[in-house]
């Protein structure tokens, strides 16, 4: 009977260690799994387990590699790792030493993003010809975003500063996570169905690709494409571009920029009105000058073509003919006596024609003067009428006539239904503002 050779635990462990570390298949291993038992050691090293439904393996990542990660690992994260298998001799346990780790799923999201982008581009959803124009003077702006956070506050502040005449309608939604996609689609449909909004602002703050993913969903892209109301998107930061940004009618880099793109600047409008008044005055003066020059030119042409000028020419011809006739009379007095008498009767009495020509000249002169006066009066009236209309649009001139602007919480009050007893209101006059409190209200039945 042969005597058995017994190995020490150390020898067996060393043998297994050599086998593991010399196996080419284990020198570079690619694993995917879920992080559990995560510890971020004070030294900077990471210790955790990678598990799936049926097994788990210990894992570690030295500080040198951990410092290059683009995210902060935590328990529950699904990751893709690259590393090698090693054995801890003192405990006889093996583990994976990791030198590369990324979140699982981002690669799939980017792939899906590109597939959807190409599909919608081929369908023509991103064509510039389909972009609806943004109205210059919106009365109602529908804002689809979270009812909390900085986005809605930035939009409200910007619109209140630039264009108080616009009414803001907030439609709160879930901007990420489960149910957010359906919430966005339903809200877009609701605004198109129920609201009288002139433009929609669809926005949310920044975040990772997973946070913004609802705005890359095909259903959301289709809902924006089908909107009858123009849509301005302000999603994420300036460097983030979602499929919703591609299909929207206008993309803004920030919520503040979206509010600016949706509204005119009141100060710019007032300046534009003043500039147009000055331009209208200039063109009116130029037209009056042109019409005056035209009338003077016509007057000169009429004078040159007048009967008086023709008579002067005929007189010269008569004088010339008389000289010829005198000479002819001396040579052939007997033969042409009757003819000379007849010509004398016709040529020596032009008074009646001259009188008729004078009357025609006076009539034409009167008509020209009347036409000139009518043209000048008409252009002056049109100019004054345009000036009054433009001045009537100036809010300051409206206030100078006794009108005022009433607001509650920076919103313009246009109806008694917008206020209640004990509300505090701000009233702006031409030379200042007053804060008042509503003691009672009485509606006017129309």
Swiss-Prot record:
Reaction catalysis annotation: Exonucleolytic cleavage in either 5'- to 3'- or 3'- to 5'-direction to yield nucleoside 5'-phosphates
A biological process term (GO) from this entry: DNA catabolic process
InterPro entries found in the cross-reference section: Exonuc_VII_L (IPR003753), Exonuc_VII_lsu_C (IPR020579), OB-fold_nuc-bd_dom (IPR025824)
GO molecular function: exodeoxyribonuclease VII activity; nucleic acid binding
This protein's GO CC annotations: cytoplasm; exodeoxyribonuclease VII complex
One Pfam match: Exonuc_VII_L
Region forming the signal peptide: none
The entry's keywords: Cytoplasm, Exonuclease, Hydrolase, Nuclease
Cellular compartments annotated: Cytoplasm
Principal place of residence: cytoplasm
Keyword Nuclease: yes
Protein EC: 3.1.11.6
HAMAP family: Exonuc_7_L
Family: Belongs to the XseA family.
Oligomer status and interactors: Heterooligomer composed of large and small subunits.
Task of the protein: Bidirectionally degrades single-stranded DNA into large acid-insoluble oligonucleotides, which are then degraded further into small acid-soluble oligonucleotides.
Annotated protein name in UniProt: Exodeoxyribonuclease 7 large subunit
Organism of derivation: Acholeplasma laidlawii (strain PG-8A)
Gene name of the record: xseA
């Amino acid at each position: 009977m042969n005597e058995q050779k017994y190995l020490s635990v150390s020898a067996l462990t060393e043998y297994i260690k050599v086998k593991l570390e010399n196996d080419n298949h284990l020198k570079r291993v690619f694993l995917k799994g879920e992080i559990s038992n995560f510890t971020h050691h004070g030294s900077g090293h990471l210790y955790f387990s990678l598990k799936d439904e049926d097994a788990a393996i210990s894992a570690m990542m030295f500080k040198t590699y951990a410092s290059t990660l683009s995210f902060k690992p935590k328990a529950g994260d699904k990751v893709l790792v690259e590393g090698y298998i090693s054995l801890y001799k003192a405990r006889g346990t093996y583990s994976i030493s990791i030198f590369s780790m990324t979140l699982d799923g981002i690669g799939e999201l980017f792939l899906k993003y590109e597939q959807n982008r190409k599909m919608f581009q081929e369908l023509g959803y991103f064509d510039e010809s389909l972009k609806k124009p943004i109205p210059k003077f919106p009365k109602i702006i529908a804002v689809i975003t979270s009812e909390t956070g900085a986005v809605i506050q930035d939009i409200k502040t910007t619109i209140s500063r630039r264009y108080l005449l616009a009414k803001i309608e907030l439609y709160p939604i879930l901007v990420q996570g489960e149910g957010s996609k359906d919430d966005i689609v339903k809200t877009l449909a609701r605004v198109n169905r129920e609201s009288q909004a002139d433009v929609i602002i669809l926005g949310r703050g920044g975040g990772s690709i997973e946070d913004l993913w609802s705005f890359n969903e095909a259903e959301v892209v289709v809902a924006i494409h089908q909107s009858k109301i123009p849509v301005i998107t302000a999603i994420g930061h300036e460097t983030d571009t979602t499929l919703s940004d591609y299909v929207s009618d206008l993309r803004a880099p920030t919520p503040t920029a979206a509010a600016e793109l949706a509204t005119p600047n009141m100060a710019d409008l007032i300046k534009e009105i003043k500039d147009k008044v000055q331009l209208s005055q200039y063109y009116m003066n130029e037209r009056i000058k042109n019409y005056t020059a035209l009338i003077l030119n016509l007057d000169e042409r009429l004078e040159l073509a007048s009967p008086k000028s023709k008579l002067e020419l005929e007189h010269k011809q008569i004088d010339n003919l008389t000289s010829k006739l005198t000479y002819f009379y001396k040579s052939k007095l007997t033969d042409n006596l009757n003819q000379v008498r007849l010509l004398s009767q016709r040529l020596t009495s032009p008074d009646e024609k001259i009188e008729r020509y004078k009357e025609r000249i006076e009539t034409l002169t009167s008509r020209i003067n009347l036409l000139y006066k009518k043209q000048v009066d008409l252009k002056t009236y049109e100019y004054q009428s345009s000036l009054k209309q433009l001045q009537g649009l100036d809010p300051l001139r409206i206030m100078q006539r006794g009108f005022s602007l009433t607001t509650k919480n920076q919103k313009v009050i246009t109806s008694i239904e917008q206020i209640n007893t004990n509300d505090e209101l701000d009233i702006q006059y031409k030379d200042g503002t007053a804060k008042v409190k509503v003691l009672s209200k009485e509606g006017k039945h129309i």
